[in-house]
Amino acid sequence: HTRELGDTLAAIAEDKSHVITGEQKCVYFAEQEPEVLEVLVRRAEAMQVPYKIYGRDFQAENIHYTCSGMLFDVVIGDNTYPDLQIPLLGEHQAKNCALALAVCMDVMADLCRKSDTPDIFSETMCNQIRRQLSAIHHPGRMEILSSDPFILLDACIHSASCENVKDVLRHLGIQNCTVIVGIPEDKDYAGVARSMKDVAARIILTRSGNPHYHFSQKQQESLAEEGIGTIWTDSVKQALNLADSCPDPIVILGTTSVISEVERIFQRS
């Protein structure tokens, strides 16, 4: 939405920063580009809201890829939560988990001061955190729908997010994929196709049935002008059937409506 928000990271951050209203006890900043962090910090200080920053106040360390997801430690202040595992793929998932835990620990610390809530830093609490994290299910977020054949589903709608997808594929030793792209024309479908072409044996374009989003075969024509060959399909089901006819691993990238349709199809099957 660059028309409404601006065409630079700093301009977009300036708009988004107004969620900091001065009423918050604390705000938490994920890993950011320097110009974005500068805007967010300036807003927090102007509104006199305390803030915590990834890499300074909390962070994920010792991040490893496994066949079951990500394994890592989370450091919050002087405390370390070791050997946490989440059934999601991508280094960013570990970093997002660190941010979420930092928020939760502060909320729990407040509760501990006000009640008889168990010590949040006890070994019992750490084990409970591990159990809950290992049971996370987050549809369409680097979700492995199948391991044989390999099918990865992610709600990626811009080229920047493709780097996370490609990083996962590199760590898993996967290449020459059939890539299904279901991204509306007002989003970065072209950037996603450009980014994924070097790991794609073929790129299949598709559309969701949600009338709120606009898809058309002009996407295929536009990419062809850049020398990127694609196959157009009129539905998610058609795209999946076409992908299934090939022996290659499958990566499905798309907007939330496309993700929902894929999930429904796999649930039925």
Predicted regions and their residues:
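Acidic, Mg2+-coordinating active-site environments of NTP-dependent enzymes
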Residues: 1-83, 97, 101-115, 120-124
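Short amphipathic alpha-helical segments
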Residues: 5-6, 40-42, 164-166, 191-194, ...
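Flexible, gly/pro- and Lys/Arg-enriched active-site loops
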Residues: 2-4, 130-133, 140, 204-223, ...
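Short, surface-exposed connector motifs at secondary-structure boundaries
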Residues: 18-27, 172-177, 199-202, 246
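Nucleotide phosphate-binding/pyrophosphate-handling subdomain across enzymes
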Residues: 1, 11, 73-202
